Amino acid sequence: MAELNVNIGNLPLKNPVMTASGTFGYGIEYADFMDISRLGGIFVKGTTIQPREGNDYPRMAETPSGMLNAVGLQNKGADYFAEHIYPKIKDINTNMIVNVSGSSVETYVECAEKIAELDRIPAIELNISCPNVKQGGMAFGVTTCGAGEVVKAVRRVYPKILIVKLSPNVTDITEIAKAVEAEGADSVSLINTMLGMAIDAEKRKPILSTITGGLSGPCVKPVALRMVWQTYHAVKIPIIGLGGISNWKDAVEFMLAGASAIQIGTYNFVDPTVSIKVIDGLNDYCDRHGFKSVKELIGALDIQR
């Protein structure tokens, strides 16, 4: 049996398989029918400093090989999370990581400070795909200045592991990755959803209330793989790969491209136990190929012809 443990900065994971924010609730919802402690980590749903109601319905749409969502970061706020959710998840025997969102640098900082007070939360994941209301709604993560500004501010107040989730809706994701690395990010996770749209031809109207939304699922996997591979060769901090992963083979591909760990997102809606199957599949793959540790896969892509 291969060793499956990996590290994200100073954060040890029992294996590289984690669930993505917004696709697995707070983890406890699945505890009755799967052993969630087997996971390398659980990224809990996006949290903001103030409660958010989310966008109007309809806010989800099925697409070929994927789905669009425009949920709008619906959550009850950081105080509610600390008082009501944290006590229920703090003793789960895996890494519980909070996805943090904001509408300004200040709200990111406030939320990060609140989560930092929770002893059993070892890391946060900054969602920098959120629009900056002070800059006309442009997402923080689409410019090096915007991404660097929010990471620098959060790094000042957040002493634990800081993971930054990168947007694919950019010209060169490696420049964004280098900018957040320079401002103190311990790791980057990529990719977030791609901007997409669905139209009802009969009604001649957009399907989503927000017109556009985030595209995820198997359709984005080739783009995600390419961006992970490019980023692996651009930064020194560890990469968490995500985007269209639905089985152990996908996970292996992301690790070969340079990911130290992976997140499973959309496929949790198809099979909530998929992450356990991926863990077992990774172990089998390593055994079949003679790898003593899953770490040997990281960046091991052979590009020679």
Swiss-Prot record:
Its cofactor is FMN. It is found in: Cytoplasm. It holds the Pfam family DHO_dh. Gene3D superfamilies: Aldolase class I (3.20.20.70). Binds 1 FMN per subunit. SUPFAM superfamilies: FMN-linked oxidoreductases. Pathway: Pyrimidine metabolism; UMP biosynthesis via de novo pathway; orotate from (S)-dihydroorotate (NAD(+) route): step 1/1. This is Dihydroorotate dehydrogenase B (NAD(+)), catalytic subunit. It comes from Parabacteroides distasonis (strain ATCC 8503 / DSM 20701 / CIP 104284 / JCM 5825 / NCTC 11152).
